[in-house]
Amino acid sequence: MKILIAEHYEELCKLSAAIIKEQIQAKKDAVLGLATGSTPVGLYKQLISDYQAGEIDFSKVTTFNLDEYAGLSPSHPQSYNHFMHEHLFQHINMQPDHIHIPQGDNPQLEAACKVYEDLIRQAGGIDVQILGIGANGHIGFNEPGSDFEDRTRVVKLSESTIQANARFFGGDPVLVPRLAISMGIKTIMEFSKHIVLLASGEEKADAIQKMAEGPVTTDVPASILQKHNHVTVIADYKAAQKLKSASFS
């Protein structure tokens, strides 16, 4: 596990964008795993800037998003489908049929999960997987207690995640969906060739310390990343402040 400490959020975004840019320049038909939430927004802004500068061509790139709320249509303003189009896809030259986001509004959620898992497998896995981390150590919607053998599946959101995400729903936790489709931990670990985890802010400091330096435990789902052979953590100073060491290999 390699840990990079960024001086500030803007540097975090530039460092992570550089990894993606290098991957696409090396392999035009790269497969990217993407995340939502506030942390990757700056990364996507940087990628848009690089695209507009002619430094990245997304025309052959394929993407898979980590997760999606159950019960929200793709056009719902708080759906992750809407988020991704607003913050990235509508600003770059992605082919629409190369964009994959779990179908949260599919009445057959279990079947949709299997289809999604199969699509990732058929794509040959994910070259670079972007992850955020929850204050409770979750990755995707794999909450504490999630089995490390889980594949893409329907998950129940924890109360802490519902409260954390309420800010996207006008501050009202009642409006936050209780279920979501998420890549499972096994999916992420097995299919991702390079995992890039982003963390910003002091509210992530405990999770980052436990993820990197604590025991591997389902109580901290992100701790399983210690077992992956190619992980880059990019954290700003506030998120990294509780690490005992910033040098890992």
From Swiss-Prot:
Active site residues per record: D67, N136, H138, E143
Residue pairs linked by disulfide bridges in the UniProt entry: none
Keyword line: Carbohydrate metabolism, Hydrolase
Pathway entry: Amino-sugar metabolism; N-acetylneuraminate degradation; D-fructose 6-phosphate from N-acetylneuraminate: step 5/5
Enzyme Commission number(s): 3.5.99.6
PROSITE patterns: GLC_GALNAC_ISOMERASE
Phenotype of the disrupted gene, per the record: Deletion of the gene prevents nearly all growth on glucosamine and severely reduces growth on N-acetylglucosamine. The gamA-nagB double mutant cannot grow on glucosamine or N-acetylglucosamine.
Reactions mediated catalytically: alpha-D-glucosamine 6-phosphate + H2O = beta-D-fructose 6-phosphate + NH4(+)
Record's GO cellular component terms: cytoplasm
Enzyme class: hydrolase
Pfam families noted in UniProt: Glucosamine_iso
Keyword Chaperone on entry: no
Induction conditions: Part of the gamAP operon. Strongly expressed during growth on glucosamine. Expression is repressed by the HTH-type transcriptional regulator GamR.
InterPro entries noted in UniProt: Glc/Gal-6P_isomerase (IPR006148), Glucosamine6P_isomerase (IPR004547), Glucosamine6P_isomerase_CS (IPR018321), NagB/RpiA_transferase-like (IPR037171)
Domain of life (superkingdom): Bacteria
Any one GO BP annotation for this protein: N-acetylglucosamine catabolic process
GO MF term set: glucosamine-6-phosphate deaminase activity; identical protein binding
PANTHER family: GLUCOSAMINE-6-PHOSPHATE ISOMERASE
Miscellaneous notes: The gamA and nagB genes encode isozymes of GlcN6P deaminase.
Function description: Catalyzes the reversible isomerization-deamination of glucosamine 6-phosphate (GlcN6P) to form fructose 6-phosphate (Fru6P) and ammonium ion. Required for growth on glucosamine and also provides the majority of GlcN6P deaminase activity during growth on N-acetylglucosamine (GlcNAc).
Family, per entry: Belongs to the glucosamine/galactosamine-6-phosphate isomerase family. NagB subfamily.
Protein name per UniProt: Glucosamine-6-phosphate deaminase 2
UniProt source species: Bacillus subtilis (strain 168)
Gene: gamA
